[in-house]
Amino acid sequence: HQSTCGGMAYDTMNQILWVTGQGSTWAQANAITLSHLENYSFEDGYHPIEFDMSYNLYKIKRASFMTYHDGALFVGFFTQDNASVIEKYLINADGTLYEKEDMNLKRTVGVTDPVAYAVSMQVISGKVQGMAFYNNKILLTRSWGILPSEVQIFNYSRYGILSTSEAYKTIKFPERLEQIYQDGGSIYALFESGLMPTGCHPLTELTVL
């Protein structure tokens, strides 16, 4: 599992927590229901919680971060320098991901069953660690190592390019900013502090803006 701290999203309509993952070959989106989480106890057998749903994501190299917005799951792939993508997956009324047959996958790798289908894709710049929506705006966090972080703000467009040059506003942040989450009039910011280089200065709290 090589996701960042931004690799979780919560579906508020269906009360499902989504978690990024990596299978033996493909990126994955995995889901756990809120009721399952509330009834889980590690002390009951000392086993990790099992996913209620798991989907291979065939069109994205790795699922690094994700967010939920307006009945859809947005999944992005972190790269250090090269351009990358965010893909949009619709969520059905029962909380499952929208699936359909993909003739290209059937022809190239022999996948014949319906698969989680990305209905749109947007290009992003490198170093993107997290994503949020706020007042019809898209917010992307960018950070790498000890360099200052930033939040880039874009006007929301289904097919818009979300590269650095297209941002209409950029806000500087301290280093190691990863995921952000919008709730009401507040933005919650999560900073990396679990890796060896950052562990000597752990950050155990969320920052509310």
Feature-to-residue mapping (PLM):
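Asp-box/WD-like beta-propeller blade repeats and closely related beta-sheet repeat scaffolds
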Residues: H1-G6, S35-D70
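Structural motif
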Residues: S24-E38, D81-Y98, I146-S157, L195-L209
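Structural signature of eukaryotic scaffold interfaces centered on beta-propeller domains
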Residues: T4-Q15, Y58-V75, V123-Y134, E178-A189, ...
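Conserved blade-ending motifs and adjacent loop-strand segments that build the rim/top face
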Residues: D113, V119-K127, G160-G184
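Conserved beta-strand positions in repeat-built beta-propeller and related beta-rich domains
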Residues: L17-G23, V75-Q80, L140-I146, A189-G194
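Hydrophobic, aromatic-enriched interface-forming segments
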Residues: L57-T112
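Beta-strand initiation motifs
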Residues: H36-M53, A93-A116, R158-A167, V208
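Loop/turn-rich, solvent-exposed surfaces of beta-rich toroidal or solenoidal domains
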Residues: V111-G160
